[in-house]
Amino acid sequence: MVNLTSDEKTAVLALWNKVDVEDCGGEALGRLLVVYPWTQRFFESFGDLSTPAAVFANAKVKAHGKKVLTSFGEGMNHLDNLKGTFAKLSELHCDKLHVDPENFKLLGNMLVVVLARHFGKEFDWHMHACFQKVVAGVANALAHKYH
């Protein structure tokens, strides 16, 4: 669950409805892989991730980024039940993929950077604060199975 006021929820959902999940998803995942290169070990099957240019040109990074943000969008539709929404993904990442749950926070922060870059002045301090709450809630829900 994310503690947003009714006005904050309305603002977050309005901005989210403008997000190009393919573009922003690929960029957010790409940034994660470049800024935190140790995360690349989970994506060895993606091919060449040897340079930032290779990461951002990688079709598999773009496709998986879109998949990630599409799933994130499902969470946006269920802000009051994030743990339920992400229960199966939490189990997958914990039991099968063995992803360090700290990576969910890192990816959330990359998403905030990408949204700020794409939306400029529209992504003001208020919107930033709201989205930090959302990405923290999603990261917490994804880490739920680990507890």
From Swiss-Prot:
One of its GO terms (molecular function) is hemoglobin alpha binding. Keywords: Acetylation, Heme, Iron, Metal-binding, Oxygen transport, Phosphoprotein, S-nitrosylation, Transport. The modification S-nitrosocysteine is found at C94. InterPro entries: Globin (IPR000971), Globin-like_sf (IPR009050), Globin/Proto (IPR012292), Hemoglobin_b (IPR002337), Hemoglobin_oxygen_transport (IPR050056). SUPFAM superfamilies: Globin-like (SSF46458). GO terms for biological process: hydrogen peroxide catabolic process. The modification N-acetylvaline is found at V2. The modification N6-acetyllysine is found at K60, K83, K145. Residues 3-147 form the Globin domain. Heme b binds at H64, H93. PROSITE patterns: GLOBIN. Red blood cells. One of its GO terms (cellular component) is blood microparticle. The modification Phosphoserine is found at S45. Pfam families: Globin. Belongs to the globin family. Heterotetramer of two alpha chains and two beta chains. This is Hemoglobin subunit beta. It comes from Dasypus novemcinctus (Nine-banded armadillo).
